[in-house]
Amino acid sequence: MRSLCRLLRASVLIAAVGCHVHQVAPLDPERLSQEEMLQEHFTNVYDAVASLRSGWLTVRGTDSFKQTSQIWVYYDENRLGSVDEMRSVLVNSVASLRHYDGVDATMRWGVGHSAGAIQILSHK
């Protein structure tokens, strides 16, 4: 009888743990795939980033005492503009996105990137 109670408790515990739903962290917090964006039914890239990787839109660092820093957006290797430009880029037209912090963005694209950059990668 005692072993039957233990077995019943173990079964209930396993069932409860197995049914627990939890959020899974993104595989790479510096990348965002088209699949992730489409899975959540986003149509434009800005809304996807604002919802799934909101930290990418937070300005950190300054370029000078007079001007506030800006996060730059690149489409492949071409500067698109500010993050607002992502509103016009459709999720279906991109393969993935990559975030660069200020140091990495400055190393890649030069001075004026202390706030970082977001690179939109097309289907090549």
Predicted segments, located by residue:
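Bacterial Sec signal peptide processing site at the extreme N-terminus
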Residues: A15-S33
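A beta-strand signature from Gram-negative outer-membrane beta-barrel systems
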Residues: V94-K124
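Sec-dependent bacterial lipoprotein signal peptides
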Residues: M1-C19
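Extracytoplasmic
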Residues: L27, E40, L52, K66-Q70, ...
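Post-signal-peptide N-terminal segment of Sec-exported extracytoplasmic proteins
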Residues: Q39-S64
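Periplasmic plug
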Residues: F65-V103
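Short, polar/charged loop or turn motifs at beta-strand boundaries
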Residues: L27-Y46, W72-L80, S122
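Short beta-strands and strand-coil junctions in structured, solvent-facing domains, enriched
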Residues: G55-V59, L80-S82, V103-R108
